[in-house]
Design a protein with these regions (language model features):
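Rossmann-like S-adenosyl-L-methionine
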Residues: 2-7, 13-17, 223-497, 505
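Internal alpha/beta scaffold segment
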Residues: 157-201, 222-254
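Short, charged amphipathic recognition helices of the HTH superfamily
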Residues: 499-510, 521-522, 536
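Short Lys/Arg-enriched helix C-cap and helix-to-coil transition segments
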Residues: 536-549
Length: 571
């Protein structure tokens, strides 16, 4: 299959992240994103690497039997919701299946590795759950009228005005419509990403789920030729505040951003009305949030996530952390740290984003917590500087996971238990392999769905340091005579019972090349080992390769691999 090939296939399964495996009539497998199991799709191959083909979705020819829900009007054009046509219970089943496969491919199944996979907790709200949106200004087609919404799927320039978006509530939709109507009526140009000319860039909207407080931040350039900015912004404020809302307006802001990059960046913010912040509540604690604060976008889902983590940490003994020090690494605005502070001696949070650390300190004071300490800096460097050692470690890293060197330093503390909260299962699977190789075992895993209708999912893992099941005390006397062990026999016995040298994939490949004169791929060795019922988890890269469409080894190579396995006494 070559680049540019246009074909059809039926989606056999979907692997995380959102990678559908479409099977053609000829049995070829192609990765096609944004698909659902059971769909018949048309695709165009746009990438071929290592005999693995990836295609761009052109059309869904036949719907999946799973698709029984009516989508919002923007489904298919907007790049936001992939699973909106699938009933919610089936959505979370799909996510659970994807994460289970990733984890079992990386560290083994529940039975093989001895952990418990509890399942998945759904979001309390299935729609209108988001507390934050970043809308972009632009047009829906070249030189079209002003649009305000989300980027079209697969497009850098074109937008979709998501006036009926179903993952936010009516207040968001009212704000979007009021803003678009106002600036359209005044003929204000948007910032063109190609020419870097124009005024309107983004509209950031946040609404607290518990308190109902709303803040809106209009992000623009400083290019004000042709209109009076002060009068324009006064009119914008009036257009917003004269509408009806279920919530209450806490602030209207204006942020300037002349950066070329198409991101929401703060180069100076002024308050047009009210305050520059609002308050949200989680599990009895209060949090002050600004337009640019990091905070989970699903408040009720966040409560489920953090409650799951807290249950993993405390278990059946709610006093287990009394008098102990907890490290919250990659602590963000300190949400988890503050939830754990009442049940331990001290919580030390480490976060690289300085603004988030300032917010964490302010929120801890707001909640009357004086045993929280937050440090701004890279976890990799800060761990070398902290003198007090932790009794427990909580990990909540960004999407890319934990740097291998940082994992090494974390493991050196030798804490009995850790909890790892992950927003990207592929990074989690990779990191768990390292923890297990270094003496930790996975005890429990649970997924939490924070993002209904999308493919994203959070995962919570409890890790514990491996310990002996029991101990036997034996008194041994060395020397000559009855009941004693001769000293000179110890070396002989040690040599006789010395563990066999670990047989690596590299050794197998070198043996085959030397004897047969050809090379074999690591994934081929893993495939043969799998067929023979042998463990493969000592070679994560090989296991990862097995998940991708690849030709099978020839019978000649299979026999060569088996010969090598016999030579090294593996079989």
């Amino acid at each position: 299959m070559k680049k540019g090939f246009r074909g059809t296939g039926t989606v056999e399964r979907v692997d995380f992240p959102n990678k559908g495996i479409a099977v053609t009539d000829d049995g070829d497998r192609v990765i096609v994103k944004n698909t659902i199991p059971g769909q018949k799709v048309e695709f165009v191959v746009n990438k071929v690497k290592h005999q693995r083909a990836e295609g761009r979705l052109m059309e869904v020819i036949e719907k999946s039997p799973l698709e029984t829900e009516e989508p919002c009007p923007h489904f298919g054009m907007c790049g936001g919701c992939t699973y909106q046509t699938v009933p919610y219970e089936k959505q979370i089943d799909m996510k659970l299946t994807q994460v289970k496969k990733l984890i079992s491919d990386a560290i083994g199944t529940e039975k093989e590795a001895g952990y418990e996979f509890i399942g998945i907790h759904g979001s309390p709200k299935k729609s209108e759950y988001r507390n934050k949106m970043e809308f972009s200004f632009g047009d829906e087609y070249k030189d079209g009228p002003l649009a305000l919404g989300m980027h079209k799927r697969g497009s850098f320039y074109d937008l979709v005005t998501v006036s009926d978006c179903q993952i936010v509530d009516e207040d968001f939709r009212t704000i979007l419509k009021a803003t678009l109507d106002y600036f359209s009526k005044n003929n204000i140009p948007y910032f063109h990403r190609a020419t870097h000319k124009g005024y309107l860039r983004h509209l950031l909207v946040r609404k607290a789920t518990k308190t109902g407080e709303i803040i809106v931040d209009l992000v623009t350039t400083t290019q004000t030729e042709g209109f009076n900015e002060e009068e324009l912004l006064a009119g914008f404020r009036y257009a917003l505040l004269t509408r009806h809302y279920d919530g209450s307006f806490k602030g209207v802001l204006h942020t300037k951003n002349d950066s070329v990059a198409d991101v929401v960046k703060n180069e100076g913010t002024e308050v047009l009305y009210g305050d520059s912040y609002f308050y949200e509540e989680l599990l009895g604690l209060k949090f002050k949030i600004t337009p640019f604060s990091f905070f989970q976008t699903n408040s009720l889902g966040a409560e489920v996530l953090y409650e799951t983590a807290r249950e993993f940490i405390l278990g059946d003994d709610k006093d287990s952390l009394n008098g102990k020090t907890v490290y919250d690494l990659y602590s963000g605005t300190g949400t988890i740290a503050q939830l754990m502070a009442p049940v331990c001696k001290e919580v030390v949070g480490v976060e690289i984003v300085e603004e988030a650390v300032c917010a964490a300190k302010e929120n801890a004071t707001l909640n009357g917590l004086d045993n929280c300490k937050f440090i701004a800096g890279d976890v990799l460097k800060v761990l070398d500087e902290i003198e007090e050692k932790p009794d427990y470690i909580i990990l909540d890293p960004p999407r890319d996971g934990i740097h291998p060197k940082a994992i090494g330093k974390i493991i050196e503390y030798g804490v009995e238990n850790m909890v790892y909260i992950s927003c990207k299962p592929t990074s989690l699977a990779r990191d768990l392999q390292i923890f297990m190789d270094r003496g930790y075992r996975v005890e429990k895993i649970c997924c939490v769905d924070m993002f209904p209708n999308t493919y994203h999912v959070e995962t919570v893992v409890l890790l514990s340091h491996k310990k002996a099941d029991s101990y036997i005390h034996i008194d041994v006397e060395f020397g000559e005579g009855e009941g004693k062990i001769p000293v000179d026999s110890i070396a002989k016995r040690a040599e006789a019972y010395k563990p066999k040298e670990k047989v690596t994939y590299k050794m197998i490949k070198e043996y085959i090349e030397a004897k047969y004169g050809f090379k074999v791929h690591t994934a081929y060795i893993a495939e043969v080992k799998r067929d023979l019922g042998l463990p493969m988890y000592d070679a994560p890269n090989a296991v990862e390769e097995l998940k991708q469409p690849k030709k099978h080894p020839t019978p000649e190579k299979v026999e060569a691999i088996k010969d090598a396995l016999r030579y090294f006494a593996v079989i």
